[in-house]
UniProtKB/Swiss-Prot annotation:
Lineage: Eukaryota, Fungi, Dikarya, Basidiomycota, Agaricomycotina
Its biological purpose: Probable toxin that belongs to the MSDIN-like toxin family responsible for a large number of food poisoning cases and deaths.
Highest rank taxon of the organism: Eukaryota
Family: Belongs to the MSDIN fungal toxin family.
Tissue and organ expression note: Expressed in basidiocarps.
Name listed for the protein in its UniProt record: MSDIN-like toxin proprotein 2
GO molecular function: toxin activity
Organism per entry: Amanita exitialis (Guangzhou destroying angel)
NCBIfam families: amanitin
tRNA processing recorded as keyword: no
Length: 33
């Protein structure tokens, strides 16, 4: 099970991390959206 979680975590966090970093640059996220 740990192997499955290890493979899923990067897939889940891959799109999440950029969104969090984009929130720090609110001007960029607003420009994109």
């Amino acid at each position: 099970m740990s192997d499955i979680n290890a493979t899923r975590l990067p897939i889940i966090w891959a799109p999440v991390v950029p969104c969090i970093s984009d929130d720090n640059d609110s001007t960029l996220t607003r420009g994109q959206r």
